[in-house]
């Protein structure tokens, strides 16, 4: 079933869009089944769970951290992941810069770049519980310019999560707003930086809409693995 799900989803994605298999809360056996089906990129949202699973998977498995990241967990995450999707403050980015500098050798041994890629999380949903910058906050942070001094953090694009709703047009409006913000931010701050190119939005229930709105990376969990096991 997992192999069939992956084949169906991958077959529906444009060639330039990557599938992040959201493996959080799922047992290692299911992750291995997805790996056997050809999936190599997995997303986790808990630092300790990520570390435990990474130790049990082949070395060519790629890991992204996709959940809210507390600063005290950064040192656990940065030796393992190629990308962090959930940057919601300058302070978090500064801690990632500091910790990644300490783990450069370990990252290289794992086949990772000395620089860790990050996505800036944009708050587009109606729920106040979701994290992320408003577009005003994001511009303020970028205008400050401190991020330009980072040597171990590479800004790779934006991430967002839509409102949890059955209103498909609301979801489309939110994703389209995120794409507009991405285009403006890239033009204003990253016009000479070809690395700022990722749009991470779309999950199991809404990724087809996300694809219409410029997504380059979809995060699918239950659509691959079934319901979570807590």
Task: State where each predicted segment sits.
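Conserved alpha/beta-domain cores
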Residues: 1-205, 211-213, 225-227
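Divalent-metal-activated hydrolytic enzyme cores
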Residues: 216-217
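Short C-terminal tail/terminal secondary-structure segment
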Residues: 220-230
